[in-house]
Amino acid sequence: MNQYLAITSRGLENLLAEELEQLGAQSIQVVHAGVRFKADQSTAYRCCLWTRISSRIIQVLSEFTVRDDMDLYLGAAAINWTEYFSNATRIVVDFNGTNREIRNSQYGAMKVKDAIVDRFTKADLRRPNIDREQPDLRIHMRLSGEKGVLGLDMAGSGLHQRGYRTEAGRAPLRETHAAALVLKSGWTPGQPLLDPMCGSGTLLIEAAMMAADIAPGLKRKRWGFESIKDFDKDAWLEIHAEASVKARRGPAKVQTKFFGFELEHRILAIARDNAGRAGVKELINFQQGDATELKAPEGFDAGIVICNPPYGERLGTTPELISLYTELGNRLKLAFAGSSASIYSGSNELLSCLRMRADKQFKLPNGALDCVLKTYLITAGSVKKEEGEAEGHVEQENVAPDFANRLKKNITKLNKWAKKEGIDCYRIYDADLPNYNAAIDKYNDYLIIQEYAAPKTVPEEIARRRIMDVLRATIEVTGVQTDKVILKVRERQKGKNQYQKLSNAERHIIVNEYGVDLKVNLYDYLDTGLFLDHRITRKMLGDMAKGKDFLNLFAYTGSASVHAACGGAKSTTTIDMSNTYLGWAQENMELNNQVGDQHEFIQADCLQWLQEVDDTFDLIFIDPPTFSNSKRMKQTFDIQRDHIMLMENLKRMLRTDGKIVFSNNKRQFKMDLEKLNELGLDAKNISDKTLPMDFAKNKHIHNSWIITHKED
C-alpha cells in the first residue's frame, strides 16, 4: 500500500476522513487541513474519482527535514524519480509553504525541480520538460516549519474542477466547498433542498449529484495518475465504468425535490446549463425569484433551506445586506416552520440579522475569509401573530433599544426644527451614547452613518456588533430605504481629511440650505462636499456679503461663495488647491444662476497665493486645515503655529471696514490675542453663535472668529 495525503479546507478534516473511510481507505489520520491514509492503487483511484470534499490527493513519496535550501534539494534528490515517470512526461512543481530560510515558494519550486532534473541527467536520461500550462503530472511539495512532504498529485489539477461549471455567478463557491456545506447542513438524500439565492447552482448541483450517485470526477478528461509508471489501466477502467453505470441509472431513482431561486435571468440560465452538464438538470426546479419574497414551494415539507448569501467585503454594501438578511429571516420564519436552514456567511453580525437562534455552527473558512455555517431549526413558535395583526406577522426583536429610543427623540425634535430653518441636511445623532460611537447625518431622504474608529480598549468584535446594531436600529426607526443608507468609517477628524477618496460612484444629489442649492456626493469621500457644522457661518456670510467683494480661501466646494453670491456679493473669489473641488464650486454657483466674470475661481496653494497677491477685499472667509503637509504645498502648515502669519497676510488684503470670518476645527485652538493686537487687529469669538442646534452637544467641533482692523 502507498501513503497518501488528501488535502481539504480547515474545518473539513473529519468530514473528509469519514468519506475516505467509506471509500475503503485505511490507516486514516486527521492532520491540519488534510487527512493521511493508506490505500492500494484501486482504492486510491476510487478516492480520486469519488471524493466530493478533497481538493487534491497526493501520493506521498518522501518526508524529510527542511532547514534550508540545501536540505530541500537533497531531500528531493534522494527520490529516484525515474521510477515514477519517464522523461517524456511534462511536469510542473507546486510548492506550498515557507519557513525562515525558504521564504519564496517559487524559489522552493525551483530547487525541487533542479533536484528532479539532476536525477534524470545523472542517469544519462534526457531531462523531462517543464510545462506550467498543461503538465501531465504535478509534483507537490508542502513545507510547514522544518517539515517537508513531497509527492505526486494523483488528480493533476484541483479536484473541485468537476467539468460542469464553465461559467459562474457572483463570488462562486468551489464545488468541493459547496459539497461540504451540503453535508455539514445535515441534509440527507430524500429531504427537499432549497437554495433561495442559488446563483450558478453549485450547492444544489452538488447535492443532486449525491442523490443521483454521480461520481464528482466522472467528467474529468485527464488524471495525473495516468502518467505514473505503475498506472493500472485495467483497474481504472473498471472503476470508471462502474461509476458511469451508476451515473446513467441514478437520476431516475431520485425522489428528492430540489428548488433553486435566483433574481437574475442571466445567472439562472448559467445554473440550468451547469446542471445539464452535471447530468442533474431534470432533478432541480430552477425559478426566478427574490429571496426577500420567498415562499415554500409545493412539496417542500420538513426540508432544508441552504444558501450562501452575500456578506459584503466592501463596507458600503452593509446597509442593503442588513435588509436582505432581515427579510430572509422573516421569510424563513413565516413560510418554513418545521424545516431547517443552513446559512453560510463571512459575517456573524449579518447572520444575527436573521433573528434566529442557531442550533449548530461550524467555522469553515472560505479561502482566506473566515466564514461560518450556522444551522437553524425553524419552529412554528418563531412566528407570533398578535390580535388585529395580519396573518404571518413576525415578532420584531428590539435592537439596541437605548440607541433606538435616543434616535427617535432626536428625530422628533430635529425634524421640526429643520423644517422651520429651511434646511435639507442636518445631524440627527452625534455619538450621544458612548457605546454607539457614530454620527448620523440626514441629506434629504438619505442617511450617512459615520462610525468613529473605536478605542483600542474595545474588542473589534464588540465594535463591529455595535455598529451593526446602529445600522439595524437606524433603518428600523427611520424607515429609510437601505439603498439610501451609506456607512463610512472615520477617525475623529483631525483637520480636514475630505480628500481621502473611498470609491468612484460619482452619485450626487442636490440639497437646499436656506434657499441655496448645493451639490453633495454621499459616496466617494469621507465628507460629502458640505460641512454641516458650518451651516450658520455660511448663512451669516450670505447676510454680510451684499455689495461686497468676497474672498473664500481653502474654499473646498465653494458653498460659502455660493451663499455670498446669493446674498448679493459684488464679486466672489474662490481659491482651492484642488481642480476637482473648484469645478464642483463652479457647478454649485451655476445651480443658483450665479454666473459671470464677477465670480472667479483660482487653483492655487492658498498660503503661497496670499504672499503673492495685492488684491483687497471687504469680506474674507478662511477655514484652513488644522494641519497640512500636502505634496502640492511648498511648506507644512499648522493652524496653532501659523495662524498669526496667516493673519499678517490677510490684514494686508483686508479693506479698512472689512471683516475676516476665520474658522478652524482644532479642538484646543488658542488665538494669540496679544500678537494679533500687535498686528493692529481685533478678534471676537463667535463660536457659540455659529454652532447649530444639531451640533449643540459637540461644542468644540469648530471655533469661529470675526477679525477686523483695530479702531484708531
UniProtKB/Swiss-Prot annotation:
Its EC number is 2.1.1.173, 2.1.1.264. Residues 43-154 form the THUMP domain. It catalyses: guanosine(2445) in 23S rRNA + S-adenosyl-L-methionine = N(2)-methylguanosine(2445) in 23S rRNA + S-adenosyl-L-homocysteine + H(+); guanosine(2069) in 23S rRNA + S-adenosyl-L-methionine = N(2)-methylguanosine(2069) in 23S rRNA + S-adenosyl-L-homocysteine + H(+). GO terms for cellular component: cytoplasm. The keyword Metal-binding does not apply. GO terms for molecular function: 23S rRNA (guanine(2445)-N(2))-methyltransferase activity; RNA binding; rRNA (guanine-N7-)-methyltransferase activity. It is found in: Cytoplasm. Belongs to the methyltransferase superfamily. RlmKL family. It holds the Pfam family THUMP. This is Ribosomal RNA large subunit methyltransferase K/L. Keywords: Cytoplasm, Methyltransferase, RNA-binding, rRNA processing, S-adenosyl-L-methionine, Transferase. Specifically methylates the guanine in position 2445 (m2G2445) and the guanine in position 2069 (m7G2069) of 23S rRNA. InterPro entries: 23SrRNA_methyltr_KL, DNA_methylase_N6_adenine_CS, RlmKL-like_Mtase, RlmKL-like_Mtase_CS, RlmL_1st, SAM-dep_methyl-trfase, SAM-dependent_MTases_sf, THUMP_dom. PROSITE patterns: THUMP (PS51165), UPF0020 (PS01261). The keyword Transferase applies.
